[in-house]
C-alpha cells in the first residue's frame, strides 16, 4: 500500500486501481470510478490534490496526480453552464446523468475562493429493490400504508434517500396513484409503472423554492403519496403533518440520531404544544432510523436499523409526550413491528459482520449497548 506524498492518506495500490485511466478528462476519470469494482460512497475533489474516495474504512487517494483548476472548471461546465455565477454566490448542488450512472455534485470554493472543490455522491439510475436493502419485514411494510406520516431518520449520508426511493418504487409497482416527491436535488429517477410520478426539485433553478412551498402545493395536486426530502424547519414540519392528516401517505426524511431524538425534534418543530403532540400521535404510522456501518473487511457497508410501528399503546405515550416511555417499550420488545438499534447491531456483531467500535459509534443507546459487549 502506498501513501500519498503530501499527506497521511493512503493511495490505492496498482492492483486495487488497475482499471483507472492514467489519462483522460476529469469526467472520464469519474465515469471509470463509477463503473469500477471499487467500493466507495463519495468522490472528493480538491484543486491541486489527487482524486479521493470515501471508502467504508476511510479516505483513499486514487492516484498521486493532482487535479488542476482547468480540469475542475471543465467538469463544472458539464454539470452547470452558469457555474461561475453560481459558485460566486455560494456552493451549489447538481444532479445529472453520466451515461451509466447518476450523481449529485456539490461544487464550492475554499481558501478565500482561491481553490475549487467538489464532492460527488453516486446514486442508482433506478431505485434498488426494497427487499434487497436489508430492511426487516416490518420496515418494508411501511410502503404498504395508505395514509399517515412515516419518518425516515438518521445522520447525514446513512442511506435515507435510497430507502425512500425504494419504498416509493415498491408502491409504484403494487398500486395505482399519483406520487409527488419534493427533493433537493432530485436524486434517483423513479420510472413510471402503475403510478404517475411527479418529482419536483427545490432550488433557484428548480420547480419550487422550498420544501415548505412544495408541500403546500402538493395538497392541491391530488397526491396519493408525498415525499418530503427533508424536514428542515417548523413550517415544513407543520405542513407535513397537515398533509398526513388530509389523507395521503407522507414519507419524510429528518436528520436525527435516534427514534426518540427524531420524535423530540418533530414535537419541537411543531411548537411543543399538547395539541400538536396529539395530532402527531394520531397521524404518525412509523419511524425508521438507520445507520450504515463498514464491514469488518472494509469492503462494503451493512445497514443497521431501529424501527417504531405505532400501536395504540405507543400512540397514547406520544400523545402524552412521554418519549422516555416509548424508548422503554421498545427496549422491552413489547410492541409488534418495533425493534431497537441495539438489536440490529447485536445480529451484525453475532455474524462477525461489523466491529465493536463501529457498532458502539452507531448505537442509539450506549448504556444498553454496554450490556451487549
For each predicted feature, which ranges?
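Short, flexible helix-loop junctions that flank or precede catalytic/ligand sites
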Residues: 2-373
